[in-house]
Regions:
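Amphipathic alpha-helical interaction modules
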Residues: 20-62
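Amphipathic alpha-helical binding modules
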Residues: 66-93
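Generic structural signal for well-ordered, non-transmembrane alpha-helical segments
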Residues: 16, 44-47, 82, 86-89
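Short terminal alpha-helical segments
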Residues: 1-31
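Flexible loop/turn segments at the boundaries of HEAT repeats in alpha-solenoid HEAT proteins
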Residues: 11, 51-54, 93
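Amphipathic alpha-helix face/heptad-repeat signature
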Residues: 11-14, 56, 77, 84
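Short, charged/polar micro-motifs that form catalytic or ligand-binding hotspots
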Residues: 8, 29, 50, 70-71
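Charged catalytic carboxylate motif
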Residues: 17, 59, 80
Length: 93
């Protein structure tokens, strides 16, 4: 089952913005490897087209939601995570 038609331009733009933010976190040398690993999984999740946009954004919010509580994460990365969550919260079915 393909959800290709449900990916509006607004949703695709939001996903691209989130991917840019995640790539920025991955290229930051002060970010621990476990957080970079989760960021990579989130990028892969956002690239899938076999689920609805709301399901994909919910999956990503769940994955990175736990990262904000990680004591090893730098403050600027925590702010980026909150920004990503606020972008993805707008996507609904």
């Amino acid at each position: 089952m393909s959800f290709e038609k449900e990916f509006t331009k607004e949703v695709l733009d939001t996903f691209e913005n989130v991917k840019l933010l995640l790539n920025g976190m991955m290229s930051d040398r002060s970010v621990p490897r476990n957080i970079k690993r989760v960021s990579q999984k989130c990028i892969e999740e956002l690239s899938r087209k076999d689920e609805s946009p709301a399901v994909l954004s919910s999956n990503v919010m769940y994955m990175i939601g736990d990262l904000s509580q990680d004591p090893n994460i730098p403050f600027h990365s925590r702010t980026t995570i909150y920004r990503i969550i606020s972008l993805l919260e707008k996507i609904k079915d």
